[in-house]
């Protein structure tokens, strides 16, 4: 695995790190991601200007990672959701979590549990059930809560629930008002109503991250394709 910096002005690409990155987050010229080092998952901060690389946390197994206002959120192999500041302070927020997504606008973590989806306020520490039923992923798109369940995408908005797509999605992402699905036949986008569906990449992908308006696609071995959104 290699992290490569490719300038928009057409200048030659340069290698920044020999990592297989997951969960990319670009903030203030610094790239945060998870990569394996020494047999365990680590959170790494990479300065995209000078190439300096720093290990911020060694966390055993990280199933999901997000960053908001200088705080790292990690889901471990024991289904525990934890927060850790960049200064090293750590606390456990929830247990029994199979997946989570950061809603940066509302400062909320949308946590998938065996009962459905719980919204956890990262400022208030309060939790609230926002969806009951089988769920694999959950995230906000504008005012709508989107839930991926069994390959379908369900929209919850204004007290109404509707299935907007049945494409066999294996992964769900949101960028602005754009809904993105990874399916066995390709990567699709649509609007929050499930309309105006467009294929933006052919083929099947296991993993995806969005950073700086670019969708990165690949597998557990690394990202192999990028698409500008």
For the regions a protein language model found, what residue spans apply to each?
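C-terminal, non-catalytic extensions of nucleic-acid polymerases
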Residues: 33, 50-51, 71-74, 125
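Small side chains
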Residues: 111, 119-121, 138, 186, ...
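Intrinsically disordered, low-complexity regions in large eukaryotic scaffold subunits
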Residues: 170, 206, 217-219, 224-225
């Amino acid at each position: 695995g290699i992290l490569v910096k490719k300038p928009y002005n057409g200048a030659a690409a340069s290698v920044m790190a020999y990592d297989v990155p997951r969960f990319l987050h670009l903030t203030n010229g610094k790239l945060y991601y998870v990569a394996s080092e020494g047999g365990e998952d680590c959170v790494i901060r990479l300065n995209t200007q000078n190439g300096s690389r720093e290990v911020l946390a060694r966390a055993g197994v990280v199933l999901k990672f997000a960053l908001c206002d200088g705080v790292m959120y990690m889901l471990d192999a024991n289904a525990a959701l934890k927060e850790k500041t960049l200064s090293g302070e750590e606390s456990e927020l929830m247990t029994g979590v199979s997946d989570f997504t950061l809603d940066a606008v509302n400062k909320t973590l949308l946590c998938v549990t065996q009962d459905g989806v719980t919204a956890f306020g990262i400022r208030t520490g309060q939790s609230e059930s926002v969806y009951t039923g089988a769920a694999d992923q959950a995230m906000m798109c504008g005012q709508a809560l989107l839930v991926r369940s069994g390959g379908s995408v369900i929209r919850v908005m204004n007290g109404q629930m509707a299935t907007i797509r049945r494409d066999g999605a294996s992964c769900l992402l949101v960028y602005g008002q754009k809904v993105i699905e990874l399916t066995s036949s390709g990567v699709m986008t649509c609007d929050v109503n499930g309309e105006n569906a467009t294929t933006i990449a052919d083929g099947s992908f296991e993993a995806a991250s969005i950073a700086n308006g670019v969708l990165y696609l690949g597998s557990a071995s690394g990202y192999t394709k990028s698409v500008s959104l």
